[in-house]
Amino acid sequence: MAPAGLLQTSLIWVAYGVAVALVLLVSVITTLTWQTPHERSIAVSIVSIISLTALLATVFLLPVDIALVSSTASAHLGAKKDWATPGRVDGILLTLKIVYYTLYTLDALLCLIVIPFTYFWFEEYDEVEEEEGTSSAAARIWRALKYTLGFVFLVVILFLIGFFVPAAGNNPGKHMDLDYFKRLLAANNGEKALTFGVGLLITLGTLLYILYTSAGLALLPVSFIKSAPSISAPQLSATTASALEHNRELQRQLEMRNSGRPEGMSQKDRREMDALLREERTLVRRERLAAEARGDNRSKIYRAWTKVEAVFRPLKLLGGIFLLLLAILIWVSMLITGIDKAANSICKQHCGYILGHLNVFQPINWIFVQSAKAFPVDYILMALLVLLFFSSSITGLATIGIRFLWVRIFQLKKGRTAPQALLIATVLLGPHDPRHQLRGRHARGAAVRHLRHADLLRQPAAATRASSPTAASTATWCAPAPRPSASPAAIGRLHADRHVHLPQPRPPSNWPRLRRPSTSGPSSSSSPSSSSSSSPASSRTPRLNLSELDEEAEVDERGGPAGPAPAAALARPGAISPAAPRRTPPRRARRVMARRLGTRMGVGRARGVKLNGGAATENDKKEKKNGTWVWAWVWEWEWQTDWLAE
């Protein structure tokens, strides 16, 4: 029987290794796809890839924990298998514990030191100083290190609060003598400080979980249902070609009308010509985008992928409907469990509303229990559920953006995400802690009041299914069920499980208010998903936002050197080509320009800025309403002023 157990545990670890390799590939693709190519940094890309890989590896370790621990016991009886001797079980737990502590330590180092240092290091880069040679790598590293040390100092203060405050509150005497510090160390307050720090991060992660994941659960299925090509290439190409031909005809008429005048164009005609030239630049950009959407000058692989994507469009629609139903099912399960906890918890808020057993039918729990009859199905479902929550968090981040209260600091878009936004998004995803509940093949102890952990493992009759009722619902103390898990104590102590009933000598947490609400607890966290998912927006055809399209194309052209001009732009003699090569303006120079124009970061729209003076024509007013006319003046101002040389 020993080779069978060794084979099963080895297969679990091999599956985990394959999952981590796939996670690494997904992290690389995600980072390179979302990051803007104009401000791409090798250091930021590497740190983002490593952080996402470590985060997802930590998340996917939870199903591995469930699978390894459950493999030592019979799925039908709850008794230990013959090969699961205490030595083998201890070896499995030791391996799991090493992996747990390694990943959690790596996550902590990345979130508290590496990512802040990379963020400040990237912020300290200045292209003007680099060209002038006034900035050195050592000075840049030192400035970034100063800000990072300040951030670490704040984290240390939080740990000191967790170290001193609880013990000081329990000891009203003197607090500054040597005996007091000895008592602190003897009382294992170092672990309590770690518990406080992790609990604080998990509490913040829960708020992010409620804000971003709940919105993502609604928006992810809707995006699948409403998804359409970002640009309707044939329609946009035909419309743009017609508008461009009409525009150039109007320009030709103006030129012919003023060709015989010795004083040149009148002021009115010049304003109209300027408006037509701005409109021409916009139409040329749209024509270029339509050509890119059609796959012109693209590889055969790209065009083949576009055709395959169009063929599988109905399956994508069905997948969106399935995800929508799944999101509603998850919300219903969370609502049921929240009501069950509020009504039937024995110890109420004193232990985090823990349940001795389920009193109301819970659909998600029933699915896990039934899927446990086929060996790997329940673990695959657990991994897919975790992946769904993680994908929903990313969708919520991309939709809502990185905000402070109502102020949007960064926006996440494919191919347009700033490196700083990528690093902050990685940190925001870090505190997400989708802990599993004891569902499916988890074995737990029956109602034996003073039975210790080791005694429970030796008595198969005392183990029952995680979903079965228990007679211990009248117990007065609620504590985590004795399960041989390798999850770190400081983290496991913060998670009050719902299938628990045995007494424990000490309270489960030094900071009971910082317990992580269980996945089925905060039913309000996903309530927006049901209201948003049932909105009429899910049945409307996506509309093409031309003003946003023009703005993004303008940013692309301003962000780097452009390629050769489209043939349509050079068809008429004297046409203005928007594709003249130009250098990438440095971030600090763009900020100077933003302050002069009243824009935000040199990319936002200026309000009431018109650099050539004069009254706006009717076309100007229409274009101002769409937010496009300001860009033409910003573009001309950049060409007419030599601010790069300053």
Swiss-Prot record:
Transmembrane segments: 11-31, 42-62, 102-122, 149-169, 193-213, 317-337, 380-400
One of the GO BP terms on file: protein localization to vacuole
An annotated Gene Ontology molecular function: cobalamin binding
Glycosylation sites: N297, N545, N626
InterPro entries named in the record: LMBD1_LysCbl_Transport, LMBR1-like_membr_prot
Record localization: Lysosome membrane
Main location, first listed in the record: membrane
Comp. bias (Low complexity): 460-490, 517-543, 565-582
Bilayer disposition of the protein: Multi-pass membrane protein
Protein family per UniProt: Belongs to the LIMR family. LMBRD1 subfamily.
Protein name, per record: Probable lysosomal cobalamin transporter
